[in-house]
């Protein structure tokens, strides 16, 4: 009768499931985290530690979250959790940007425009309610990602206290002398009826008319004399400009040239024209005239203040000098309309050029505009061309496709238009140079971010912070009704208004009667009706939120982390405001991530149908797979996502989960309080495995500390798949299953597995948060009660390295891994040739040189356990049979033969020692010892 020895084996057992079933299980985890107030437990556990503050850039409270939002929040969460594990107190307060045009437009669609069907006060309340709904919807999705934070107390830019603090930030800007009012060209959206911030402008291709226009000389004789070309050439004499915005011609007030460029008087067909010397040929080609003759040359400097007739109005305009004039295109003479271009405005100011003021807020020409009254600017383009043709001053017209600024919200072309606005001056108090100096004090990740924002700061115009909108933080200023000067008590008045806003929100300003605060001054001062640019709202949160929330303890902000578009957005506005108010950058480090694209590198788009939503990913794969994809992707460039890529992430996840399950299953029956083996008593291979984990942990900690999350994933995978999966965990199965349950051989192994599991779960937690929590709940209890959640814990301190006197050091085991790899290769060939079934059916002979023989001899009879074969002989390489193929590992050769011995039904090894015990005639001697004796003794493996 056959005896079943199954109950004498230590078979692995765990309730930790093989399948993650993440989409189903994760919501229950979240419920548990929030019922047990996990975030506050982390705060309590971290109290008193050194702080690390990552300040959340507020997403806009409108619409569902997209994959880019998910990437952003997951990266932040990985950093917060890893910093906690590294021993920092790292609070996370999520935020939302709640004012501004997109919300206004949504609410307009629901209830109509303010002051039409609904009062402005009611409209603001509707905007507030809409934003609150959007916040709640986005919040649920962010929480579902496994992101931990103070979700019950987020910061909203529409919170009354935040609105009040934004007003106080404006006060500091004024106090430090950075605010001024001026009429200046700003980006103006005709659909918004308002100015736009730099970050609200997108460049798209647009087809525009391209025209070459004649400005006839007031005195041809005077111009001939300047060019020393008296009596030369024939026909009328004109300066030629080129433009793609014909509608700006009515506002022309000058022609700009570069003082240092050479200009030619050219016979062009039957007329004489002035062109930059470098552009004569290209202009002649563009207008289709072959006959050209150079009549004279001068520097631009010599043309200054020469006068030319406006092409269709009855006045003349001067030639002025400007450094912005180049020979990159056009004619080298630039049509100058100070109302409609920043360079034009700046150079116009130097020459005291008048502002035309012909275009109203709705983008139409005012009633006094000759020829074009009441026409929209783009509608006027063909009319201007027609007028130029009519008066004989159109040299050439064609269509051109070029990059043109568009409104980010309406996707429609915008214009430059001079309007009275409030500005933060880049030069007023040296703000530009100070900001450039502060940029150099910041760590930029990746480092090219520094050059990018430096260039933007070097070239950016003054910041127009005023908007003509209803839903926004008001510019709570009082100005003189005649002089427009600020009230002398502006700072005190701002604080008084801020206190009221703190109690009642921004509506307190609109409800305020001037007399309440100004008394008799209300006769001569009025309230400013403008609101603040929303980039001022979010840009001031370093002060309006972080400096005022108790969780941050008044500490400086360590990091801002957003998409790479925020160099000109939130990073820029925050830098400008913090430098203006506090003379320093608001952050020590700035990390940017790339945009998400599909598997073919294309931007996500509804029209292409390639949008991957985080909701779909979580429903199909689970949050941990999405998190693993984010972590394993190099965020410094474009982040590619597709179903195929997510499936690969799921495969990687399974390997990690299987490793964790193996550890837990083999810790069955292990009680660290009772069974832990001291390092010096452990078996060599087990000590090496723990040391291996320590090496991995050091690399993983360093990678987390430097935000190299793809390195963390790679190191985690190498540890699970290579060092553990294909070597250590494979080798220990025999010892784990077959030795006596309480033997040193088994407890040593379990001790190693326990240390490794304690470390592994902490490495995983910042990335695979749901799974790490699941593993944590299955780990054996320790002497001191295990913390309820892994997220309150620091990286594991119990790992140890190999001692200096360790005979079988890491170099030894690395060599052995190479030998084992070669033996496995030869075994695989034998398996494929049907010479053997499994490795235990084989008897292996290793022919080795002296170095390898000495190496292998150190394991004695335990070498077979490392090679996972029933019998191993080691012989001198000189004894290698002539017909035995050379090994791929220099210094050894391997031969494999099928064992003729019997197979032990308990350990499955083939042995000549089966039947040595009459009581157990089918068992090998080793199994007899493990079943009824004191148990086999292992030293090395």
UniProtKB/Swiss-Prot annotation:
Protein name: Isoleucine--tRNA ligase
Entry text on domains: IleRS has two distinct active sites: one for aminoacylation and one for editing. The misactivated valine is translocated from the active site to the editing site, which sterically excludes the correctly activated isoleucine. The single editing site contains two valyl binding pockets, one specific for each substrate (Val-AMP or Val-tRNA(Ile)).
Cofactor dependence: Zn(2+)
Single biological process term from Gene Ontology: isoleucyl-tRNA aminoacylation
Organism of origin: Haemophilus influenzae (strain ATCC 51907 / DSM 11121 / KW20 / Rd)
Major subcellular site: cytoplasm
Similarity comment: Belongs to the class-I aminoacyl-tRNA synthetase family. IleS type 1 subfamily.
Localization of this protein: Cytoplasm
Motif ('KMSKS' region): 603-607
Motif 'HIGH' region, residue range(s) on this chain: 59-69
Pfam families, sorted: Anticodon_1, tRNA-synt_1, zf-FPG_IleRS
Domain of life: Bacteria
Annotated positions binding Zn(2+): 904, 907, 924, 927
Enzyme class: ligase
Quaternary state and interactors: Monomer.
